[in-house]
Amino acid sequence: YPDLVCFDADLAGATMTKYFKAACPERFFDMGIAEADMVGVAAGMSLCGFKPFVNTFAMFAAGRAWEQVRNSVAYPHLNVKVVGSHGGLSVGEDGATHQCIEDFAIMRAIPGMLVLCPCDGNEMRQAVEALVGYEGPAYMRLGRLAVETVTDSIPGYKFELGKGATLRDGTDVTIIAVGMNVQMAL
């Protein structure tokens, strides 16, 4: 994907975008601790035909950069993907100011914004592939902690944007979960 570019807010070690930086340094942009500006620059690069993936902690994506995500990315329906890592309550070590549980609600309230939260590494890889092919704004929440791979045990498992997946059949109850909560629900 030569048109894919990666933006990070001085968190490449924590968000793991350091691997993209090592593989494609000419398409990696460390914007420092300036999340709102990072989203604005990504919106501009989208208008130039690039496919920007903006990476920061969920708290900063849905907090500090919310207005730019809403006005500069989602309303004009630009092809920018916002990845909020360290979402939810799994970031206890980082303190309460970094625990973001409202990011789903905030991002989903924006008209035209696709919101997703993969349950494991396998689903995340498939979700990123799907997002590269999706034309429009999207928000993907990732957790901080390592999670058990649950989708590898499902023969022919295929992630699809906008669709849920039945991971275990049953007859007495339906449990709906996303992200790292899927392994707990199973």
Task: Enumerate the predicted regions with their spans.
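A short, charged/proline- and glycine-enriched loop
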Residues: Y1-P2, R168-V173
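A short, charged helix-loop
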Residues: D152-S153
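Thiamine diphosphate
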Residues: Y1-R141, A146-V147, Y157-K158
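Glycine-rich phosphate/diphosphate-binding loop of Rossmann-like nucleotide-binding domains
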Residues: T174-L186
